[in-house]
Amino acid sequence: MKETVSELLQSALATLQSDGTLPADQSFTPQVGNTKDKSHGDYACNIALVASKAAGCPPRKLAEALVAALPENSAVEKVEIAGPGFINFFMSTASAFGIVNTILDEAQQFGRNNSGNGERVQVEFVSANPTGPLHVGHGRGAAIGDCLCRLLEANGYDVTREFYYNDAGAQINNLALSVQSRVKGLTPEDESWPEDGYRGDYIVDVANAYLAGETVVADDREVTAKADPEDRDAIREFAVAYLRREQDLDLKAFGVQFDVYFLESSLYEDGKVEATVERLKANGYTYEQDGAMWLKTTEFGDDKDRVMRKKDGGYTYFLPDVAYHLDKWQRGFTTVINEQGADHHSTVTRVRAGLQALKADIPQGWPDYVLHQMVMVTRSGQEVKISKRAGSYVTVRDLIDEVGRDATRFFLAARRVDSQLTFDIDLARSQTNENPVYYIQYAHARICSVLRKLAAEGVQRGMNECVGELSLLTLDEEKELANQLAKYPELIANSAAQREPHHLTHYLRELAGQFHTYYNAHKVLIEDTALRDARVSLYLAVRQVIANGLDLLGVSAPEEM
């Protein structure tokens, strides 16, 4: 319906350009939005306010001319001018229910489009250090990143999911020292325990597996433990592989799969880090000072130059990041989205500066970043900080075990990425209307229950057929439900374009609320079979949209609860 209103306004604008009311050499694009107050109609447009200067007349006078020039259309019941010149459209009841047929015809494809036209997009997310179990912050990144991938795919993009393993650097040495200490029988309470060693129970698990000579497989790589307490390199290799496997198992339990696992260590092994250094030097963007090598990042918007290579010859963490992103570009990804925690904020400018200094024809502002804020977990109103398994933080596995995958994924994606999130375990476990994922799933299950009752009476209802005369639907609640359903395709497009999956959770919560209100107020299993069938058609459309939306969130749509 919004497209219909936009087309009518475009026609009216063209008419006013033809008669000289508006200049013919300018383009005008009406922005049509949903109204918040239904007394103002279903859709509103401010084009008269935007174009009034070009017309040389007050906005309200231009609005009157536009309304007069609108073509006749049976979908529009009436048009009103409000305030200084807003144009409000009231759609006919019959037109509102056309969306029901569309939904039932398109089924799982409803809401999808091909605007991406198959463009390749790489989304990097989670990318945790292989030094321990995934914490709840990684979980938020996984929920947001995977939902964003699903949204992009729903808009016709060819998406590659990538996980970058930081398997080189000081944190890996600390991991090796920690496991080696456990292998030798030490505990964190011993004086000789590594100063920056990891203390969680999972270190004991790694040590025991190493001593037992276990073989672990992490994605496509197999590592067998040597069981030698003195071979720190072997311990390091095994510990990284073991924890990568554990992270993979956590992600599998979370319903997240990756297409590519990229190892930081491979950048060194393949000479890509050194090649990046040489290219930056050749381009004249490096200098030596105080025994270190610096990159002139200030020439690309950074607030100060950054150390690339330290006095001891080791590279700072942002240099392999630059090499890694050059590799992404060379793989042909012109659109790259990095979903990371907000603690990576300082790396954005540095990485982009390094990429510009490479002179590789990479656009300024590439890649895109989606940075999420921290997560606080609470139980009984008190913050939960410690997991026995991890030692110092709450893990993704903890949440899945407590509340299940569906609730964990939904809650972690339910807020703006730039807002801090409080994960209330008690709320996520509750079976009440206050729990949004339960409330939404219950709407789906309720509709399935109605269909089962009809089937028990010998009345079968297909998923992709309109079974009733929709003109019999005359209630305001029915029209509001239809209007809410009609918003879904635009919501999917905007959520992907804006990189904001939380809009989908809010939409589904609102749709479920409208359905429950309607369900409680108006029976569907009634003697008037014609009206019953019309309402069942509306039910089927609601069920389909809820199922489609939950699927994009990676959440199930149960038929029974």
UniProtKB/Swiss-Prot annotation:
Pfam families: Arg_tRNA_synt_N, DALR_1, tRNA-synt_1d
Keyword ATP-binding: yes
Chief localization: cytoplasm
Source taxon at top rank: Bacteria
GO molecular function: arginine-tRNA ligase activity; ATP binding
Short sequence motif 'HIGH' region: positions: 128-138
Keywords assigned: Aminoacyl-tRNA synthetase, ATP-binding, Cytoplasm, Ligase, Nucleotide-binding, Protein biosynthesis
Quaternary organization: Monomer.
Family, as annotated: Belongs to the class-I aminoacyl-tRNA synthetase family.
Record's protein name: Arginine--tRNA ligase
Protein encoded by which gene: argS
